[in-house]
């Protein structure tokens, strides 16, 4: 009987091999067509369709490689397994004779006779084929099945074969299922032994291990894998049979015919057998997991734990294993708290169960096999010079699998890494040994001569060595990827730690800045409390006038004759020959010095502190003004580049500025500033912005000339009498006409003196009124200015000698401002005279400050000057070539 089954098994393997070869050739031909299509689509530019074909090619390659290897080695593995089973049975019989206790853990497969006589799916395969031949709606006569067909538990030996044709048609399926039953898939004996191995943990604790038993356990695990595969094949065949029966039933129903009872019963039989096979598959998978756990404990466990390795793990034993892990609770408490993201990226340090370890191990092994297949396919495609896009896709898949392996390995504690790699290497060695055994027992190997066998063995050993090297390289690469990821995680943690420290340091820095900010206003007060007198820049209203922030209280320049405190400075740098010195001597001939006037400590402190604050404000304002001037210059330069064509036209149309245009020009300067050429041109309406720029440059040049002339006249006429503040100062004429200095008519003394009972607020109000009057007089028409100039020429200068004795001595003086007014009014002719010559030559020479006003830049202190309303209210007149070189300060008259 045994010889019959062996002869029967040789038939389907050849047919399966031929079928596999045909399917492989068909796949290869299909891949060639796919590659050709990909090239055509790429030439046409249809990249989306190319990607679809590439995915299809990739899936075909992945399916083709394992199919070819599996079909080539299937027959050899079956023969080797049969011989190994016989050897194992003999070894078990010898062990049973030596010791009364049997090794229940090893799943002894049934004998060949049991597998032949056991109920197997061959019956329903035969019946299924018979039904496929006879059961169809076109042939309503259904052949009655024999009792063996209705009874699935009938042995194969008792199944009658009615005709030779049916036996011939079902030979292949019968033989394939015989090979599956020989592995103990559906055998009741093998299932009973599996249940005994699961349900008898008390007997397993008595078993003593030996090297032969460890080999048997590894062999049994391999056998369990083969049994699982056979069971899966059986389930697949049962599902196919069910689908065929369903199609037959649907055909009957579609033709409104009654379904035969035999077909319905056969459907129920297939369904029940499918459920039974699925249950067997679950039992075999659980048995395989236990066997792998036992094998792992044999390789890893210490001698103290070997007595408990054969038992299935209970929850208590799992808890005991968790307590035996090297990591103690104290070590976990010593670790720093981490965020959930860091915990997800960092390797797990907590103990894991055996089931979790086995799952991770299976994942890594399966991904290693996929990586190996992909590398083989890459080598084949490279040798055949396939499409580089396909190669790139395979390489990307390998990289993704390696990263997935590293991520899976991170979930294991570090002490498990070496154990996992050793277990993987041991599994590879067992598979290679089994493969070598199968090859040596094959008929092809037996036919070879001893010399050929030696060469063949060397080739196999070389292949095995190469596989071992590849596995080690994969493991080393995996550890390198894991280490690189750990370094990246450490760097991220360090950066997060630094950011956390910086975040903690920010409140301290803010607190320090707040303290420094609080200490900064105290420093000027400490400087003011010292005995140093304030400098001229501190209390000089000149810089404040430029910034437009001058006020009587900030400057401390109020004075009166009713005992109010006055603040002065020691002007040690002023010489009697300087214009300021001469003005001081002439305004107060009885006074020898103006300096060293004592003041109270409170007023000195406030003046010094306010002076420093004003100085800081001046600097900030000057910086802002410079930036604004630069921006304005840039904007104007861009506009000038665009309007170069208009300049040529403006040269031809240039004419003298009339008095009305000049008055409008002055009003526009007062409103918009001297730098806003476009606004001034819109206001004047008869000139464009280029002509306005030329007029501004000419106007500023004339102002400088007039200033130089006034400085020279002040030095040459020391006998001039200073006018009282508040008198009209209007004059018309050119600088050439002002050879002798023109003096201003002083008002009668009764109008200038104020009663001593006036308060400082009343004095300030009167000064403001005078300033407004001066501002209104400054804007009078030109004919009124001419009349005042004629009256001013008829004035007798000898009457001024009586006035200084009646006036109170002012602490500071200013030169007469009539020349300044003459300079302003005389600029009209000079501007008109120089318009034609300086139309476009002086367009970029204007250094005027638009924020400080017209007369501030030129150092001419007229009441009502644009941009200096605060100075007008105070009544301070300033004169000098430059602000910082030669200033002169005068307080308002009484």
Curated annotation (Swiss-Prot):
Polar residues biased stretches: 140-149, 300-309
Region described as Disordered: 93-221, 299-353, 492-539, 601-659, 703-852
Ranges of compositional bias, category Low complexity: 93-139, 150-221, 310-353, 492-527, 710-742, 751-805, 815-845
Superkingdom to which the source organism belongs: Eukaryota
Domain HTH myb-type as annotated: residue spans: 649-704
Portion annotated as DNA-binding: 677-700
CDD domains hit by this protein: SANT
Main subcellular localisation: nucleus
Subcellular location: Nucleus
Name of this chain's protein: Myb-like protein K
The organism's taxonomic lineage, starting at the top: Eukaryota, Amoebozoa, Evosea, Eumycetozoa, Dictyostelia
Encoding gene per record: mybK
């Amino acid at each position: 009987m045994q010889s019959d089954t062996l002869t029967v098994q040789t038939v389907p393997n050849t047919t399966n091999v031929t079928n596999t070869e045909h399917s492989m050739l068909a796949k290869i031909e299909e891949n060639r067509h796919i590659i050709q299509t990909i090239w055509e689509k790429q030439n046409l530019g249809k990249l989306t369709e190319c990607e679809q074909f590439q995915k299809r090619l990739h899936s075909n390659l992945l399916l083709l490689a394992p199919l070819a290897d599996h079909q080539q080695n299937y027959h050899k593995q079956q023969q080797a397994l049969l011989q190994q089973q016989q050897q194992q049975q003999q070894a078990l019989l010898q062990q049973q004779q030596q010791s009364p206790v049997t090794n229940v853990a090893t799943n002894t497969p049934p004998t060949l006779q049991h597998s032949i006589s056991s109920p197997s799916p061959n019956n329903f395969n035969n019946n299924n084929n018979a039904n496929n031949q006879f059961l169809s709606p076109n042939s309503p006569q259904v052949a009655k099945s024999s009792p063996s067909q209705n009874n699935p538990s009938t042995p194969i030996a008792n199944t009658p074969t009615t005709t030779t044709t049916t036996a011939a048609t079902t030979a292949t399926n019968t033989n394939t299922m015989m090979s599956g039953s020989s592995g103990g898939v559906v055998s009741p004996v093998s299932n009973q032994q599996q249940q005994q191995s699961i349900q008898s943990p008390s007997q397993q604790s008595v078993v003593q291990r030996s090297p032969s038993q460890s080999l048997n356990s590894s062999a049994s695990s391999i056998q369990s894998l083969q049994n699982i595969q056979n069971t899966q094949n059986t389930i697949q065949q049962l599902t196919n049979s069910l689908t065929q029966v369903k199609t037959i039933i649907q055909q009957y129903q579609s033709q409104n015919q009654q379904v035969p009872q035999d077909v319905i019963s056969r459907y129920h039989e297939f369904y029940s057998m499918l459920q039974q096979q699925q249950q067997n598959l679950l039992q075999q998978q659980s048995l395989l997991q236990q066997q792998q756990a036992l094998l792992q404990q044999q390789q890893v466990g210490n001698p103290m734990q070997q007595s408990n390795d054969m038992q299935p793990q209970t929850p208590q034993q799992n808890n005991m294993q968790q307590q035996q892990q090297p990591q103690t609770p104290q070590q976990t408490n010593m670790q720093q708290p981490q965020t959930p993201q860091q915990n997800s990226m960092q390797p797990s340090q907590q103990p894991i169960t055996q089931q979790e370890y086995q799952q991770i191990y299976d994942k890594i092994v399966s991904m290693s096999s996929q990586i190996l297949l992909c590398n083989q396919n890459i080598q084949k495609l490279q040798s055949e010079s396939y499409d580089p896009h396909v190669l790139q896709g395979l390489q990307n898949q390998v990289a993704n699998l390696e990263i997935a392996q590293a991520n899976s390995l991170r979930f294991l504690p570090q002490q498990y890494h070496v154990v996992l790699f050793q277990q993987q290497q041991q599994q590879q060695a067992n598979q290679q040994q089994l493969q070598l055994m199968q090859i040596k027992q094959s008929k092809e190997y037996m036919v070879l001569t001893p010399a050929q066998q030696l060469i063949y063995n060397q080739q196999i050993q070389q292949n095995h060595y190469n596989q071992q090297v590849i596995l080690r390289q994969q493991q080393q690469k995996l550890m390198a990827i894991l280490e690189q990821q750990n370094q990246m995680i450490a760097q991220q943690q360090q950066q997060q730690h630094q950011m956390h420290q910086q975040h903690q340091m920010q409140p301290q820095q803010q607190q320090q800045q707040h303290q420094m900010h609080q200490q900064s206003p105290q420093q000027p007060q400490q400087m003011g409390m010292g005995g140093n007198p304030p400098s001229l820049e501190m209390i000089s209203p000149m810089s404040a006038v430029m910034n437009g922030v001058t006020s009587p209280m900030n400057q401390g320049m109020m004075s009166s004759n009713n005992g109010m405190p006055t603040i002065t400075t020691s002007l040690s740098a002023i010489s009697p020959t300087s214009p300021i010195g001469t003005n001081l001597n002439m305004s107060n001939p009885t006074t020898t010095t103006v300096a060293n006037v004592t003041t109270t400590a409170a007023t000195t402190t406030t003046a010094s502190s306010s002076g420093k604050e004003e100085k800081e404000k001046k600097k900030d304002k000057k910086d802002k003004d410079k930036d604004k001037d630069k921006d304005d210059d840039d904007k104007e330069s861009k506009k000038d580049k665009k309007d170069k064509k208009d300049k040529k036209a403006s040269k031809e149309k240039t004419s003298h500025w009339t008095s009305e245009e000049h008055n409008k020009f002055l009003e526009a300067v007062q409103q918009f500033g001297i730098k806003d050429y476009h606004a001034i041109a819109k206001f004047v309406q008869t000139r464009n912005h280029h002509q306005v720029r030329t007029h501004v440059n000419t106007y500023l040049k004339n102002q400088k000339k007039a200033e130089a002339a006034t400085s020279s006249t002040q030095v040459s006429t020391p006998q001039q009498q200073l006018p009282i503040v508040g008198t009209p100062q209007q004059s018309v004429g050119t600088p050439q006409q002002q050879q002798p200095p023109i003096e201003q008519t002083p008002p009668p003394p009764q109008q200038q003196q104020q009663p001593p009972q006036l308060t400082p607020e009343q004095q300030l109000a009167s000064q403001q009124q005078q300033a407004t009057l001066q501002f209104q007089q400054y804007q009078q028409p030109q004919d009124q200015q001419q009349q005042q100039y004629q009256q001013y020429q008829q004035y007798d200068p000898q009457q001024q000698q009586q006035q200084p004795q009646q006036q109170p001595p002012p602490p500071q003086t200013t030169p007469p401002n009539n020349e300044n007014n003459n300079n302003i009014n005389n600029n009209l002719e000079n501007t008109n005279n120089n318009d034609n010559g300086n139309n476009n030559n002086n367009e970029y020479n204007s250094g005027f400050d638009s924020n400080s006003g017209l007369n501030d830049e030129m150092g001419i202190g007229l009441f009502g000057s644009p941009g200096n309303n605060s100075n007008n209210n105070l009544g301070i007149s300033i004169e000098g070539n430059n602000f910082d070189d030669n200033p002169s300060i005068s307080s308002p008259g009484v």
